[in-house]
């Protein structure tokens, strides 16, 4: 597991705060350390008076966020770990939704599971033509657990949202926009 300081890059350009999830070898999958770092980094930029807009992106060109880090989740057996795993993502997603600054997702590749749920929390999305979005948890027998089903239905045509949730299929950037 990477150290929190290694997994999240914070930069500022003029009045733009940029959060880069920095785990390209794992397709920027969200383990507990990354979730903790994301909570802290987002709060830092959200409370910075010099930052007027926040951009969230993923390192590398293959993935924005490929979802939760299943290897990390499965490496721990205690119920408290599962609760921490879920609580952290709910904290940051809710904070993104209620932020008084515009939050932009710059989706540069795969956005699966928690990655799709993360971009659904943002105000504006810029999605690369090669990006794929989806909620594949259903193929593992899991319902998306970070509010993605509720956000997707509010933001997409109901039939498209149901298709994604029931099949676990992926959609292209062109279909998503």
Residue ranges and their predicted role:
Residues 2, 95-177:
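Crotonase-fold acyl-CoA enzyme core
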Residues 25, 62, 71, 150, ...:
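Glycine-centered loop/turn positions within well-structured domains
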Residues 58-95, 111, 141:
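Glycine- (often His-adjacent) and acidic-residue-rich active-site loop
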């Amino acid at each position: 597991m990477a150290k929190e300081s290694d997994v999240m890059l914070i930069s500022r350009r003029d009045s733009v705060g940029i959060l880069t999830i920095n785990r390209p070898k794992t397709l920027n999958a969200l383990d507990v350390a990354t979730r903790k770092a994301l909570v802290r980094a987002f709060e830092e930029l959200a409370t910075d008076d010099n930052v007027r807009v926040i951009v969230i992106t993923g390192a590398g060109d293959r993935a924005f966020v490929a979802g939760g880090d299943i290897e990390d989740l499965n490496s721990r057996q205690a119920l408290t770990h599962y609760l921490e795993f879920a609580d952290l993502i709910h904290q940051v997603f809710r904070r993104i939704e209620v932020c008084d600054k515009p939050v932009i997702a710059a989706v540069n590749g795969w956005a699966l599971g928690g990655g799709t749920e993360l971009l659904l929390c943002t105000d504006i999305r810029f999605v690369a033509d090669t990006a794929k979005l989806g909620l594949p948890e259903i193929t593992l027998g899991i319902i998306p657990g970070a509010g993605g089903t509720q956000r997707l239905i509010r933001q997409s045509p109901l039939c498209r949202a149901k298709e994604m949730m029931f099949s676990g299929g992926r959609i292209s950037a062109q279909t998503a926009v």
